Each structure stands twice: as structure tokens, then as C-alpha cells.
């Protein structure tokens, strides 16, 4: 058999892609490992949207679902109805759907995927294809094709925390009990199995009434991040905020905050921490471009990644993974593939104008971001004196340094001056170090109101910036904070103390011996405990010191400082993922 388009994955993006391509008259082969369509939207029990509503074909499908529900009673509610609608629409337009199908090989010639082999149980099948679309989430097809992949944060390769989702009974519908459950390597069958069993404990409750009766585990764990393709255009957080991202050929726009679930923030990138910690900007929702070249793996002519594995970096991946955005890129990828198949050409040879004409593209909403990111000097000055200084701090990066320094020199100690100190610290300005030290020493408790949630106290934000500026004068006081188990905001201060000490040690090799001694006192003492609340839960606390000890041990190894942290790790109640991290550390 020969098909115009192969779609691997019939989930949130893949189901929309299959319907869109089949409607255009393309012959479509869908390979889905599960037994139903919709992915996270259906089997994941998350039928809704985050901040951005559906658009285009996805909105059309949702309208069909609502109409079907209004006509009668359906067991399972929207999630089950949506399965029926998606399958019906794909079949109605002639798509071939193979459930329980696992791709095992692809044929690649001159940068084009020309054939696929898959298994259904023990039976082997194959087909020739003209265009290919990877909508698996984990880049299964791209892996088989030999695409270059990246993923995880730069410091240690870790992905975002995942969710062990359970189906629960709502008042009038079926919903999801959707709590963070720590980190997991979903590519390891052993770790995935152990992790899913262990993290069921997050659902233990004293009361299962009030719409919280648990019905079943989700078929699909809430995996927020895996690998990303290295694409023809990699969309990065740095390029987005600097304005250097090419937005001339977009297939749509996503609206979201940079929705991180990480609670070990000191190991994220500097830019990411500047946004989240330095300016308390977690809740700031922005418009992001979805460039078409970010869908194409570098060097390939007819292959696209239309799922969360598409070409973005770890930092922006926190925002560009939501259901609405996945529907948008699924529809766009299908339209693009059909045009390329009809022209018998490579994807990038299809004129952008032809593709754009087929898409429900709105006028660019990107200028709306300016109200948060491009305040003028007067608004910056006013904002720095207020309760929501984050927008002014970020916007200040566009103002002349000399202007900010003159404001700083003229100002008395005040909220304005302290917020301005953070703005200048974003530029590595050493003149603010004395004030940062004072805020840290005072444990300044002021919390801004920039974000709707997760604002950060000035005291430990100052500690973050002291590490960012590699202030070697405060090594001993920072060490005292790390080892003090009775302090308020113990987790926040201790975690950022570790981050600061590691940064200072990287910048000042002559201080590594002393810093190493402090870090060893923490990491070799099994009674040093760090607890953090899992996001999405009211009171579920997770012990985090194991992960921090592992990072400290890795760094001390790199510095050539002997330690006995491995012996301490053997005594701790590490979770499944930490054990694997510890094993890899020992194997180095």
C-alpha cells in the first residue's frame, strides 16, 4: 500500500491532523499504539484547555462533541464522546486507522521518509509513504528516522515533573485528579513501571467525597516533556525574549504562561531563573509564535514533528505544550503535508503563502506582549516602586544602563531601590551587591504581586542574584543559611544557597575547597532534609534533598574534591528516579 501521509500517533495533535488531511482528499495512514483517538484530551482525562481556547478544526470538533452530549446521556462524558467524534470524522473522510500499531522501522532516502514498518501484536506490516508526521509526543518516528534530538535542561538533562493522573467522578462529568508526582524517565520501562506504582500514593486522601471519588488510573500519564527534535528553526527562550526569533512564517500562535512545574529551580537556566525567581513572572501569560520551520527536523524533506517533541528548547517547552497549541500545529502540519504531496516537493519548497491561505491565522497578537515586556521609562520607574515590579524589571533591560544607575545612585533605600537592584542584577551590575547583601542578611520578607501565584520573597531572590553575580564575599554566610534547618522558608533559602555556592565555585576556582567543605557538610549529613510541596496539591510534600545531594556530588567530582556523598545516599529514602540518578553518578 502507498499513502500520501503517514501519521504516527492519533492523540491531541495527530487526530486533528488526520481529519484535516483526509478532508483534503489525501490518503492517510494513522498508526496509534493505543485503542482510541485523542490522547491526553481523552485517555488522559483532560478534555479542556489551559489559558487558550481551541481554534480552527479543534474548535469545530469540540462543537460536535457539545452537540452530541446535548442530545443524550453519555457514560464517561466529554472524554468518551470525543473519542467517538474523532474516530468518526477521520473514517468518514477515508483515513485508515490502525490501533495497537507500533512502528519499528522507517526507510529514509536522501532526507525523505519513504516507507514504514510496524507491528500489531506479532503481525508485521509495511507501507510506502510520501509525507510523514510524528505526533507521538516522544518523537518515536523521528527516532526511527535518525533525527537529531535534544531535551531536558542543560544542567542535568532532567525533564519537567510528570503527573500520575487518575480519573475521578465530578458532579456532572468525569474529570481528572491531576497532581504532580515528581520526575520520571518515561523512556525506561523499568523506571516508568516503578514510578507509576510508587506515585499512586499522591492520590491517598482522608476523604473521597465531594467529587473526588477515584474511578480508574489514566491510560496516559501526564508527561509534560520529553525529547525535542533539532529543527530547521529552533525556537528558544533567549531568541523569543531578545526579539531575534524569526516570526515571518508562522502557522499559528500559542497563549500561555511559561508553566513550569519544577521545584528545584536552581538547576534551571539563568534566563529561566531570571524570569521565574528574579522577577516572579510565572503567571505572566504571553503570545508565542509557532514557526513552521520548527516542525521540520533538520535535514529532512518530508517529515514533521507535530507534538510536544517539536523544535523548541526546554525553557519554552514549558509553555508550548498545551492542548490548544497542539491542535493548531496538528492542523497546520497536515495542511502543509498535503500541499507538499500534491506538488511532489519538499516541505520547505511549498510557498508559505499557499500554506497560510489554508490556515485560520489571526492577525499577529505578539504586540500584546509589549504591555508586559516593553514598558517605557516612566512606566518602568513607576512599576519599580509598586507591588508588581516584575514587569518593570524585565522591561528595564531595554533601557540604557546609565539611566538605571543614575536612578539607583539617587534613591534612598526603599522598595523602589530594592526592585531596581534586581533589575540591575539582571545585567550583572556589581554596584548593587551591597544592597543585595543587605536584603539577604535581613531575610527581606517582601513578596511582590506580579504573578497570580508563586511570587518570591526578596530575601532569597537577593540570594539568587548574589549567586548569579558570583559574590565570593558571602560564601560563609550562605553556608550558614544552607545548614540552618530552623529558618523560615527553609527550602527556598537552602536550595538557592546550594545554587549560589555552585555558581560562586564555578566562577572562583580558588574558593572551591572552602565551598566544597560547606557543601559536604550538607550533602554528607543524612539529617539535612529539604521538603517541597508538589504543585497541584494542597499538602503533599516531597523530600528533595536527595536530588540536591546528587548534583552536589556531580559538581564536586568535576572539581576534583573527594567526598562520601555516595555513602550517605545509600542511607536515604530515595525515590525510583533518584536511585537511577545515583546509580549513574556511581558509574561515572
Language-model features: where?
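Amphipathic alpha-helical scaffolding segments comprising HEAT/armadillo-like alpha-solenoid repeats
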Residues: 368-378, 397-410, 429-450, 471-485, ...
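Short, hydrophobic/aromatic-rich segments at coil-to-beta transitions
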Residues: 110-116
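Beta1/beta-strand and adjacent pyrophosphate-binding region of the FAD-binding site
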Residues: 1-13
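Structural detector for internal amphipathic alpha-helices that build alpha-solenoid repeat scaffolds
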Residues: 385-398, 406, 410, 415-430, ...
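Flavin (FAD/FMN)-binding glycine-rich loop and adjacent Rossmann-like elements that form
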Residues: 40, 119-120, 124-131, 135-385, ...
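Short glycine/serine- and small hydrophobic-enriched flexible loop segments
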Residues: 19, 23, 332-342, 502-506, ...
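Alpha-helix capping and helix-loop boundary segments enriched in small/acidic/polar residues
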Residues: 9-12, 49, 74-77, 317-325, ...
Amino acid at each position: 500500500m502507498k499513502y500520501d501521509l503517514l501519521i504516527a500517533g492519533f492523540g491531541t495533535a495527530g487526530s486533528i491532523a488526520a481529519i484535516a488531511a483526509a478532508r483534503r482528499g489525501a490518503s492517510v495512514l494513522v498508526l496509534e499504539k493505543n485503542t482510541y483517538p485523542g490522547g491526553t484530551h481523552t485517555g488522559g482525562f483532560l478534555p479542556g484547555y489551559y489559558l487558550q481556547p481551541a481554534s480552527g478544526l479543534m474548535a469545530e470538533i469540540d462543537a460536535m462533541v457539545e452537540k452530541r452530549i446535548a442530545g443524550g446521556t453519555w457514560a464517561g462524558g466529554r472524554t468518551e464522546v470525543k473519542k467517538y467524534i474523532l474516530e468518526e470524522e477521520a473514517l468518514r473522510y477515508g483515513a485508515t486507522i490502525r490501533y495497537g500499531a507500533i512502528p519499528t522501522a522507517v526507510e529514509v532516502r536522501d532526507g525523505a521518509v519513504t516507507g514504514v514498518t510496524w507491528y500489531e501484536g506479532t503481525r508485521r506490516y509495511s507501507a510506502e509513504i510520501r509525507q510523514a508526521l510524528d505526533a507521538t509526543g516522544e518523537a518515536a518516528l523521528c527516532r526511527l528516522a535518525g533525527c537529531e534530538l535534544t531535551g531536558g535542561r542543560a544542567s542535568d538533562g532532567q525533564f519537567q515533573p510528570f503527573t500520575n493522573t487518575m480519573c475521578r467522578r465530578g458532579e456532572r462529568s468525569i474529570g481528572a485528579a491531576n497532581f504532580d508526582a515528581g520526575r520520571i524517565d518515561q523512556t525506561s520501562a523499568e523506571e516508568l513501571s516503578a514510578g507509576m506504582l510508587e506515585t499512586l500514593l499522591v492520590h491517598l486522601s482522608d476523604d473521597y467525597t465531594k467529587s473526588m471519588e477515584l474511578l480508574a488510573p489514566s491510560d496516559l500519564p501526564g508527561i509534560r516533556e520529553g525529547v525535542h527534535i533539532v529543527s530547521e528553526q529552533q525556537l528558544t527562550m533567549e531568541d523569543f525574549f531578545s526579539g531575534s526569533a524569526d516570526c515571518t512564517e508562522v502557522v499559528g500562535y500559542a497563549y500561555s504562561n511559561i508553566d513550569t512545574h519544577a521545584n528545584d529551580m536552581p538547576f534551571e537556566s539563568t534566563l529561566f531563573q531570571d524570569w521565574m525567581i528574579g522577577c516572579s513572572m510565572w503567571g505572566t501569560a504571553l503570545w508565542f509564535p509557532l514557526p513552521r520551520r520548527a516542525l521540520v527536523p533538520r535535514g529532512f524533506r518530508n517529515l514533521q514533528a507535530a507534538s510536544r517533541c517539536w523544535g523548541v528548547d526546554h525553557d519554552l517547552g514549558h509553555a508550548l505544550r498545551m492542548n490548544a497549541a497542539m491542535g493548531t500545529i496538528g492542523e497546520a502540519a497536515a495542511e502543509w503535508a498535503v500541499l507538499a504531496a500534491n506538488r511532489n516537493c519538499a516541505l520547505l519548497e511549498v510557498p508559505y503563502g499557499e500554506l497560510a491561505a489554508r490556515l485560520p491565522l489571526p492577525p499577529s497578537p505578539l504586540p500584546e506582549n509589549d504591555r508586559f515586556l516593553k514598558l517605557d521609562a516612566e512606566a518602568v520607574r513607576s512599576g519599580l516602586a509598586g507591588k508588581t515590579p516584575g514587569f518593570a524589571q524585565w522591561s528595564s533591560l531595554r533601557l540604557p544602563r546609565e539611566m538605571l544607575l543614575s536612578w539607583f545612585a539617587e534613591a534612598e533605600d526603599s522598595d523602589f531601590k530594592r526592585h531596581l537592584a534586581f533589575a540591575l542584577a539582571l545585567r550583572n551590575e556589581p554596584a548593587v551587591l551591597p544592597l543585595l547583601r543587605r536584603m539577604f542578611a535581613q531575610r527581606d520578607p517582601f513578596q511582590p504581586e506580579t504573578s497570580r501565584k508563586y511570587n518570591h520573597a526578596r530575601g532569597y531572590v537577593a540570594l539568587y542574584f548574589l549567586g548569579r553575580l558570583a559574590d565570593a564575599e558571602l560564601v560563609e554566610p550562605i553556608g550558614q543559611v544552607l545548614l540552618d534547618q530552623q529558618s523560615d522558608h527553609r527550602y527556598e533559602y537552602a536550595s538557592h544557597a546550594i545554587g549560589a555556592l555552585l555558581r560562586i565555585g564555578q566562577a572562583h576556582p580558588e574558593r572551591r575547597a572552602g565551598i566544597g567543605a560547606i557543601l559536604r557538610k550538607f550533602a554528607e549529613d543524612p539529617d539535612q532534609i529539604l521538603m517541597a510541596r508538589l504543585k497541584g496539591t494542597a499538602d503533599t510534600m516531597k523530600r528533595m534533598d536527595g536530588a540536591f545531594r546528587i548534583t552536589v556530588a556531580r559538581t564536586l567530582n568535576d572539581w576534583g574534591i573527594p567526598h562520601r556523598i555516595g555513602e550517605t545516599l545509600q542511607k536515604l529514602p530515595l525515590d525510583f528516579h533518584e536511585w537511577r540518578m545515583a546509580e549513574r553518578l556511581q558509574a561515572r
